[in-house]
Amino acid sequence: MDSREPPSLTFASVLEQLWSQLADGQRLRHSAFHQAVLATSSPRGPSARYVVLRQVDRERGVLGFHTDRRSEKWAELERDPRVSLCFFGQSVQVRAEGRAVLHHDDAVADLAWKRTGLISRRCYLAEAAPGTAAPIPTSGLPAHLSKDRPNEAESAGGRVNFAVVTVPLQRMEWLHLAFEGHRRARFSRVGFGPWRGEWLVP
């Protein structure tokens, strides 16, 4: 299905395009869907930031990303697991909502850590928590890692800070922008049941 122009649409064709773009986002770093804006709730109000899409499970309807468990994001999710993820690319916006499930000291996080490359593991070796005030611009990394990737043994120190967030989706909205007129659909489900669609005015 070409996302640049809406052909004869069905709920099935929209879901197929939607999950295909999400799958590309996980696999391809240059895909527009490789990153999403994650919205959470903080004591100050709404909080949003980009995350990298690391997991797409179409069969179960689950998305996932990695984070540092010392981050404000993690604390916000512990207080309120409700999240919204927003993707945009090729004239298509996808909003996905669910309740985050946090993984740190479990098999899900262990497996994700094993699959994470050394250069990505380096992010979790920062000596202070993300968001900590600093007197100068800094990466927070140990000096010897500022221009190099850690070896396997060095990277192991980041495991304690590494965490996985999975989001079993309960609701998705698809919006296609087109000169001929935009198109919009909403999909919802109960638990891990089937998706039910409805058309919306854009």
Where are the model-predicted features located?
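Binding-site signature for planar aromatic cofactors or substrates
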Residues: 1-202
